């Protein structure tokens, strides 16, 4: 184990000098013995000097401190010992419940599975959320992105998905909290504990207060644990909140390392870094990883390089819209912007496909008519268009749904709606079977039966 000494400290970037014939490799983990800090080598500058990024706070470091090379990348424990535990980027427990028992540690830097090992699945995962099951269904082993600006409900929607899928799903789940609020991580831990599924979940947190090196690597640590379960021939759920913070940490690290910024100030290696993470989140012939990733959209601009780079890696995209949230319709999913590769008659069946497209057609026509209504009013529309507007407003309200995880805020008990009921209900609304019910009856209900009951009280 070779030793070196710190020669420069610039915030999270630390230069360390080693003997020239003992220069550490890129991605090697170094230990600052006195401070108990781990550094990761990012660049070899020459003459035995390496530029590293700190995995924790660099407060209190000074030049001349001794640094040991571990001769290996950062490694985290994998396997059953990680279940029910909260870990940091280094795989160390941060829940004060004693050490983690493990038989294997894996490097967080792994090559993605080879092309011939990949496996595709068209099995649909039922989420119990009407708008998701109808418009952008999930595939088992697929990748789903939740896109949305600040405060439109990404984390709540993700928590509901975790609640509905992880509780129904008998396999294991891994949750990586990347640069998000510590409070949300805390809430999530107790939510899992109260619902007795904590023993099936591994939690890896690197929250907002951590330095950029930590936030850049914590997604990889979580993914390594998920890969460990996948290689044990299991089906794993992987939740990442938030992918944007991973990109942002990469931007900060890139600037600290002195690289030339590219569009909008992002790192020049944005696509490569995103690819390195996303290509590993995949299903092989041994097991599957189904991932749900929250993606923050800066200033509600979906063309921003970060969300735009993420789009290309996903099978399904759920776009949350501020306009829909302003109407008080939650989950604020935009049914015209959200897409799924699984919405195909060969996968979901002809009836589901035609119903989803009919719903989108009605909503699209309503969107086109809005300008006419704003200028001339409803009276100028033809009878056919009046019917379409009426149905579209009912569909819009029926796409809302009370969530289990939001029960404490709204007082409405959460609802899980089966896919069969969802398709049948929307088909009936589009066909005009419920034209006699007032539109208020469709707001914040689960099944169509509830809407019928609610109409009687209005």
Swiss-Prot record:
Keywords: ATP synthesis, ATP-binding, Cell inner membrane, Cell membrane, CF(1), Hydrogen ion transport, Ion transport, Membrane, Nucleotide-binding, Translocase, Transport
Alphabetized InterPro entries for the sequence: AAA+_ATPase, ATP-synt_VA_C, ATP_synth_F1_bsu, ATPase_a/bsu_AS, ATPase_alpha/beta_chains, ATPase_F1/V1/A1_a/bsu_N, ATPase_F1/V1/A1_a/bsu_N_sf, ATPase_F1/V1/A1_a/bsu_nucl-bd
Subcellular location: Cell inner membrane
Catalytic function, reaction form: ATP + H2O + 4 H(+)(in) = ADP + phosphate + 5 H(+)(out)
Chief localization: membrane
Enzyme class: translocase
Name of the protein in its database record: ATP synthase subunit beta
């Amino acid at each position: 184990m070779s030793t070196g000494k710190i020669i420069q400290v610039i915030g999270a970037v630390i230069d360390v000098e080693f003997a020239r014939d003992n220069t550490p490799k890129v991605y090697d983990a170094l230990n600052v013995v006195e401070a108990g800090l781990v550094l990761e080598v990012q660049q070899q500058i020459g003459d035995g000097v390496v530029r590293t990024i700190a995995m924790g706070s660099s407060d209190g470091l000074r030049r001349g401190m001794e640094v040991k090379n571990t001769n290996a990348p950062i490694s985290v424990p994998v396997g059953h010992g990680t279940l029910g535990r909260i870990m940091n980027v280094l795989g160390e427990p941060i829940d004060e419940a004693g050490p983690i028992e493990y038989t294997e540690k894996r490097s967080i830097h792994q090559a993605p599975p080879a092309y011939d090992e990949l496996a595709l699945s068209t099995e649909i995962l039922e989420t119990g959320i009407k708008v998701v099951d109808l418009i952008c269904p999930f595939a088992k082993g697929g990748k789903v992105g939740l896109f949305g600006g600040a405060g439109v409900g990404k984390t709540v929607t993700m928590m509901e998905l975790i609640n509905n899928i992880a509780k129904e799903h008998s396999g294991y789940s891994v949750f990586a909290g990347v640069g998000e609020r510590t409070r949300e991580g805390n809430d999530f831990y107790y939510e899992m504990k109260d619902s007795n599924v904590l023993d099936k979940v591994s939690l890896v947190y690197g929250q907002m207060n951590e330095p950029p090196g930590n936030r850049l690597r914590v997604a990889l640590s979580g993914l390594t644990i998920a890969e460990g379960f996948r290689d044990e021939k299991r089906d794993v759920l992987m939740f990442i909140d938030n992918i944007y913070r991973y990109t942002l940490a990469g931007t900060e690290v890139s600037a600290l390392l002195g690289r030339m910024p590219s569009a909008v100030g992002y790192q020049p290696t944005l696509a490569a870094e995103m690819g390195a993470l996303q290509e590993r989140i995949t299903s092989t012939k041994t097991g599957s990883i189904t991932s749900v990733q929250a993606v923050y959209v800066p200033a509600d601009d979906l063309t921003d390089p970060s969300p735009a780079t993420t789009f290309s890696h996903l099978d399904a995209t759920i776009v949350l819209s501020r306009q829909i949230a302003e109407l008080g319709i939650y989950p604020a999913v935009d049914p015209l912007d959200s897409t799924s590769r699984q919405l195909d008659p060969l996968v979901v069946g002809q009836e589901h496909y035609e119903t989803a497209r009919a719903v989108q057609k009605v909503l699209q026509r309503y969107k086109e008519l809005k300008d006419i209504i704003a200028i001339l009013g409803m009276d100028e529309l033809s009878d056919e268009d009046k019917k379409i507007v009426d149905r579209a407003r009912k569909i819009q309200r029926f796409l809302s749904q009370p969530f289990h995880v939001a029960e404490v805020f709204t007082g409405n008990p959460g609802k899980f709606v089966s896919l069969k009921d969802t398709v049948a209900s929307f088909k009936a609304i589009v066909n005009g079977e419920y034209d006699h019910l007032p539109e208020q009856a469709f707001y914040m209900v689960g099944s169509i039966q509830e809407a019928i009951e609610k109409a009687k009280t209005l």
